[in-house]
Amino acid sequence: MNNQKQQKPTLSGQRFKTRKRDEKERFDPTQFQDCIIQGLTETGTDLEAVAKFLDASGAKLDYRRYAETLFDILVAGGMLAPGGTLADDMMRTDVCVFAAQEDLETMQAFAQVFNKLIRRYKYLEKGFEDGVKKLLLFLKGFSESERNKLAMLTGVLLANGTLNASILNSLYNENLVKEGVSAAFAVKLFKSWINEKDINAVAASLRKVSMDNRLMELFPANKQSVEHFTKYFTEAGLKELSEYVRNQQTIGARKELQKELQEQMSRGDPFKDIILYVKEEMKKNNIPEPVVIGIVWSSVMSTVEWNKKEELVAEQAIKHLKQYSPLLAAFTTQGQSELTLLLKIQEYCYDNIHFMKAFQKIVVLFYKAEVLSEGPILKWYKDAHVAKGKSVFLEQMKKFVEWLKNAEEESESEAEEGD
């Protein structure tokens, strides 16, 4: 037996090719740019031909790797340096957004080019979104005309869903806001967006990314008021956006009022303090009394754990509401407020089945406590009620309404005799 180790064969002199997947391709955006610009130069300004060229080139060129360069070219005509400037020594093309005509129709046509490209190569979605976010941060480096074109294009792309409204975060950049660039850009953007859709669709998109309550941040802190926002955008021809923001602020103020009101009630704060607070909030946020009485009613009804037994809940409700009558009475100084309260009571009793038999008792209690008066009660009975539980509640109120009518007639005849 040979104990010597057998010599293993050597592979000297052999050359091996690296597997393709192991090769690191050099990152060369300049070469990619030259290929795209050459192709765009050949297609000219025919955007149909541009879209076809981009579609075909995706099979030969690495769009995934050079997405940023691709979108720089299509928007600005070439690769952008930090700050948004085009390098002087680089190739550039006039077949781009910034070199096109400054009108909505042209930007709509360019939007179609982007739509087709991203539909064809879905992986470009993220790169495009990132590219637009970057372009928005570079706004100061662009001319006013270039900013206007980009704003119109972005508005159209937001409307057709190619872009997500989260890209608007870039507009809250401190320097852009401070110099008024963000607000001016937003005017053009929202005009084209609302032109494609309506304000409700715009609002839904903003809500989806929690941007609906941030629009005032387009202005510096010392100008972040509803008054300044509505004046600026109304004068720019965007009254619907101004009204939307005003409504958003009102809704926010109402929610805050209800939250604070419930906390004050649970603490057992004196009614005079609660009334004072609510009246200050009404004045500060321009909330009308009929709206406030609805908030007060909801707050009052949410402060108690109701009995599940129908025969006991009416008694519990009367006892509870008797206690809160002075608070409710403070916000039914107008006929419309009383009518609103009646409708709120009707809806509540219908939605909470244990309260179905308590409706008339609540109304009578409020009449005696001077929360409600005969005029609004009679109007509610005649034609101002809603459909919810209508037949049940009208039947409950029949005798009381007859008594009110008789009392009213007696008062009128007494007044005539006095004359």
From Swiss-Prot:
Sites bearing N-acetylmethionine, chain numbering: M1
Biased composition (Polar residues): 1-15
InterPro entries noted in UniProt: ARM-type_fold, eIF5-mimic_regulator, W2_BZW1/2, W2_domain
Keywords: Acetylation, Activator, Isopeptide bond, Phosphoprotein, Transcription, Transcription regulation, Translation regulation, Ubl conjugation
One Pfam short name: HEAT_5MP1_2
Residue ranges occupied by any W2 domain in the UniProt entry: 247-414
GO CC terms in record: cytoplasm; membrane
Biological processes per GO annotation: regulation of translational initiation
Modification type Phosphoserine: residues: S12, S411, S413
Sequence similarity: Belongs to the BZW family.
Protein name: eIF5-mimic protein 2
Source species: Pongo abelii (Sumatran orangutan)
Gene behind this protein: BZW1
